Design a protein with these regions (language model features):
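Proteins enriched for Cys/Gly/acidic motifs involved in redox and nucleic-acid/cofactor modification
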Residues: 1-205, 219, 243, 248, ...
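Short, surface-exposed connector motifs at secondary-structure boundaries
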Residues: 6, 71, 224-231
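Short, small-residue-enriched loops and turns at beta-alpha junctions
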Residues: 54-55, 203-207, 238-239, 305-308
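Conserved strand-turn element in the central/C-terminal portion of the radical SAM core barrel
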Residues: 160, 164-171, 230-238, 264-275, ...
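Radical SAM/AdoMet-radical enzyme domain recognition
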Residues: 190, 215-216, 223-229, 241-300
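Hydrophobic, well-ordered secondary-structure elements that form the walls
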Residues: 260, 301, 321, 329, ...
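Contiguous mid-protein beta-loop-alpha structural module that forms a pocket-lining wall or clamp
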Residues: 309, 324-326
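Terminal RNA-binding accessory module
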Residues: 344-438
């Protein structure tokens, strides 16, 4: 039924948030709303907020205020992590009409209808940390991506790293029923998607609350016809055992592209962060992956300037990163997050020092990434093509190998969602390699 109303959504934050934003978009579409870009006039604006840093809180507030400025008469909905952790602040904000916390996003339509009936400010934020919660099922019938679909299979985190607010924003681990996951994967395969990415707030914890486990879920997804590639979201190092890696290596659809969260290469820093592994365990995980997969892509996250990080500790981290030799590293300068233990730790590192250390590791990341990709020059690979790319007056199509190396094929034809085999001949741009078909 067409209701002659327009809705616009804006996502802030992680892949899980992006999945939930897409699900809310489909809820509104199915109810008859016309979805328009967030920069356009709309009757309803939904901002799925983020709270991972104080800056994320600020950006969330800015986007909510921007929505109200675009149409003062619009219903502005604040959803997600910022309003979950700052409920009172959000409820006092005159620009926000409806506040929806985590695990309640599926009630968006009902909240809109209730607001329109009596025009009173609505808040629906549960105490996500002290009530036993079930997984919030939000089903995607389609996705804005063209070849690769992200599937949320887990929510919540039980780790409580000293710098992180997410366990308080997302609550305890909640795993999605595997049957619901497979039903969604099959639907996406029917719509032509050939690559699936399993994602969650703490993916490695999948099944700890239900008696299931991540490996079993991966095997189930692997059995779905039409899906030809499976990628995994961020993994905890301790999940990587010989048994786990050997099982993955026996599944041909698995992409040898693994994101193992590290944060620091110094054990003393890891202890202050309350990370539940040491550098020896982490390195063993990388060695295991390299034993079962040929030249796997291993990527990671690193925080520089964590409270108490001395020059000596940073030097230890840098040497460790060089030894592991990652494909890609996401480098973050430590940012105080109100409400975390790290925010009140002594020996906070000055901002100029954080920036200097970040620049050092960014240069190292660039060098290691180039070395990893250069390995494939002269080798035959298969890439799943995604989109057209214009370069120096020529038309190419770009895509990714299983290891997530971006390549380009010279072609005026539409190659999207097709597998193309060829030999990598060299570099087209700084981060795109040229592949010749055969």
């Amino acid at each position: 039924m067409k209701i002659n109303k327009k809705a616009a959504l804006h996502n802030l934050g992680c892949k899980v948030n992006a999945y939930e934003t897409e699900a809310m978009k489909q809820i509104l579409e199915n109810a008859g709303y016309e979805i328009v870009p967030f920069t356009e006039y709309a009757d309803v604006y939904v901002v799925n907020t983020c709270s991972v840093t104080n800056m994320a809180d600020r950006k969330s507030r800015q986007m909510l205020h921007k929505a109200k400025k675009m149409n003062p008469d619009a219903i502005v909905v604040g959803a997600g992590c910022y309003v979950q952790t700052k409920e009172a602040e959000a409820l006092l904000d005159d620009t926000v009409d409806i506040v929806i916390g985590n695990n309640k996003k599926h009630e968006l339509l009902a909240m809109l209808e209730a607001y329109e009936n009596d025009h009173g400010k609505y808040g629906n934020v549960i105490d996500i940390n002290h009530e036993k919660q079930e997984y919030e099922e939000m089903f995607l019938e389609r996705t804005a991506e063209h070849t690769r679909a992200f599937i949320k299979v887990q929510d919540g985190c039980n780790q409580f790293c000293s710098y992180c607010i997410i366990p308080f924003a997302r609550g305890r681990v909640r795993s999605r029923n595997s049957e619901d996951v497979i039903r969604e994967v099959k639907r996406l395969a029917e719509h032509g998607f050939r690559e699936i990415v399993l994602t969650g707030i703490h993916l490695s914890s999948y099944g700890v609350d239900t008696g299931d486990n991540l490996l079993h879920l991966i095997r189930e997804v692997h059995n779905v016809d039409g899906i030809e590639r499976i990628r995994l979201g961020s993994l905890e190092p301790r999940i990587v055992t010989d048994g786990f890696a050997a099982a993955l290596a026996g599944l041909p659809k698995i992409c040898p592209h693994f994101h193992l969260s590290l944060q620091s290469g110094c054990d003393a820093t890891l202890q202050r962060m309350n990370r539940r592994y040491d550098t020896r365990e982490y390195e063993e995980g990388c060695q295991i992956l390299r034993k079962y997969f040929d030249h796997p892509a291993i990527t990671t996250d690193v925080i520089v300037g964590f409270p108490g990080e001395t020059e000596e500790e940073f030097a230890v981290t840098k040497e460790y990163l060089e030894r592991i030799h990652f494909y890609e590293m996401h480098i973050f300068q430590y940012s105080k997050r109100e409400g975390t233990k790290a925010a009140v730790m002594e020996h906070q590192v000055p901002e100029p020092v954080k920036k200097e250390r970040s620049n050092i590791l960014l240069a190292l990341e660039k060098k290691m990434s180039e070395e990893f990709r250069e390995y494939y020059v002269g080798k035959q690979v298969t890439a799943l093509m995604e989109e057209a790319y214009e370069f120096e007056g020529e038309t190419y199509f770009t895509g990714y190998t299983k290891e997530y190396v971006k390549i380009a094929v010279k072609s005026a034809a539409d190659l999207s969602n097709q597998f193309v085999k060829g030999t990598i001949r060299g570099r087209l741009t700084d981060d795109i390699y040229l592949m010749v078909e055969f």
